[in-house]
Amino acid sequence: MKLLHLDSSALGANSISRELSAAVVEQQRRLHPEVDVSYRDLDRDPIPHLTAQTLAQTDPAEAAAAEAVMQQFLQADVIVIGAPMYNFAIPSTLKAWIDRIAVAGRTFQYTANGPEGLAGGKRVIIASARGGLYADPTNDFQEPYLRQVLGFLGVDDISFVRAEGVAYSPQHRADALASALAGLSEEEAAAGA
């Protein structure tokens, strides 16, 4: 089994989404000892945003880098994404990655019956950290967007591990992280049963 682990937080060691995504990967290692993990830090090693130049793919090095991102996605059975909520959505570094994998004819196609995803059969686990509480979905453009774009590509096995309200106070941050990690432990225990 191949697992692709992505982090997109700019907060480095202070990032809750990084801590959660690492915990998810460790859980997957315990459940599947044979797992082959690839890692990309989209903050430290960002993918260039789409421009007229990158779309034209006139630079062979740029084209090769884009193809490497695509192949890494296509070959993964499980994808773990550390995705903090920035301004109600996702970091632009994560959006740049999505722009490189959402390619007509590769991961989706248009048919007479409408769009069809070509990248099914994958499991995506999103480790989400949010400064506020988003029980009211009108302010949440992160989770619906990720579900929509991944679903458009054919991915229908999508789950979220959330730590919310982490900016309220140090205690709330610790409690939110502990709750998210406890949920992972419960899931692992159920999978092992």
Curated annotation (Swiss-Prot):
Q: What class of enzyme is it?
A: oxidoreductase
Keywords of this entry: Flavoprotein, FMN, NAD, Oxidoreductase
What cofactor does its activity depend on? FMN
Tell whether 4Fe-4S is among the UniProt keywords: no
Q: How is the cofactor bound?
A: Binds 1 FMN per subunit.
Q: Which InterPro entries match?
A: Flavodoxin_fold (IPR003680), Flavoprotein-like_sf (IPR029039), FMN-dep_NADH:Q_OxRdtase_AzoR1 (IPR050104), NADH:quinone_OxRdtase_FMN_depd (IPR023048)
EC assignment: the record states 1.6.5.-, 1.7.1.17
> What reaction(s) does this enzyme catalyze?
2 a quinone + NADH + H(+) = 2 a 1,4-benzosemiquinone + NAD(+); N,N-dimethyl-1,4-phenylenediamine + anthranilate + 2 NAD(+) = 2-(4-dimethylaminophenyl)diazenylbenzoate + 2 NADH + 2 H(+)
Provide the binding site for FMN: 9, 15-17, 85-88
Tell me which family the UniProt entry assigns to this protein: Belongs to the azoreductase type 1 family.
The entry's function note states:
Quinone reductase that provides resistance to thiol-specific stress caused by electrophilic quinones.
PANTHER family the UniProt entry points to? FMN-DEPENDENT NADH-AZOREDUCTASE 1, FMN-DEPENDENT NADH:QUINONE OXIDOREDUCTASE
Task: Please give the name of this protein.
Answer: FMN-dependent NADH:quinone oxidoreductase 1
